């Protein structure tokens, strides 16, 4: 059982960071809508880090990275099948959350720079990987509430890229250790966001 004080400390830190993320989107759209973007980014990071963790585990004895295995034409279908069997989806190495963050914060040149369209493609690739598999029922439409082409995120691709990029970087700062976390980050984040936005709506209503 998680230590109560540790849980509370983690929950408080998560609440502060989620509030900061919410402020990035505040004024762009209704609170009930932008929570979908925050939850969508958090969930994508969760799925991505599950992939990272699983691939590191199964490839350890082979002495290759996920990137190296995926780049090999013979190895790629093998790791894709492993991922589908174990996780129910495939996230390509270039679409891993950590690699998208690198393109936002440490891009090497203009061609390497992050675009909101990269994130949109990453999500489409993930959902597409489940087609024809049992897991498609769980993933089909899962990210539909996160409309990355919505003009309220920004009138131009550059504006939307800036907005989503800032949210993603803030989400990357959340303590998200899947092995050591004292509590359910996804579930706790959802409950905190519901509380934050209910409070926000109450203030507007009052």
PLM regions with names:
Residues 1-206:
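Non-catalytic, mostly N-terminal accessory regions of nucleic-acid modification and defense proteins
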């Amino acid at each position: 059982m998680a230590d109560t004080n540790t849980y509370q400390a983690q929950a408080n830190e998560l609440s502060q960071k989620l509030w900061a993320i919410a402020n990035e989107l505040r004024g762009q759209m209704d609170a009930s809508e932008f929570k979908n973007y925050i939850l969508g980014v958090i969930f994508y990071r969760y799925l991505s880090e599950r992939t990272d963790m699983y691939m590191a585990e199964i490839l350890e004895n082979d002495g290759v990275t996920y990137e190296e295995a995926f780049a090999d034409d013979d190895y790629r279908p093998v790791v894709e099948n492993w991922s589908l069997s174990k996780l129910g989806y495939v996230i390509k190495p270039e679409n891993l959350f950590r690699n998208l963050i690198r393109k936002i914060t440490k891009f090497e040149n203009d061609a390497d720079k992050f675009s909101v369209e990269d994130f949109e493609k990453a999500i489409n690739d993930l959902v597409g990987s489940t087609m024809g598999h049992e897991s498609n029922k769980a993933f089909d439409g899962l990210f539909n509430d996160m409309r990355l082409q919505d003009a309220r995120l920004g009138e131009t691709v550059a504006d939307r890229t800036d907005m989503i990029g800032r949210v993603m970087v803030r989400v990357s700062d959340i303590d998200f250790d899947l092995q050591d976390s004292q509590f359910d980050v996804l579930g706790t984040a959802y409950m905190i966001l519901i509380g934050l936005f209910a409070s926000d709506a109450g203030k507007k209503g009052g």
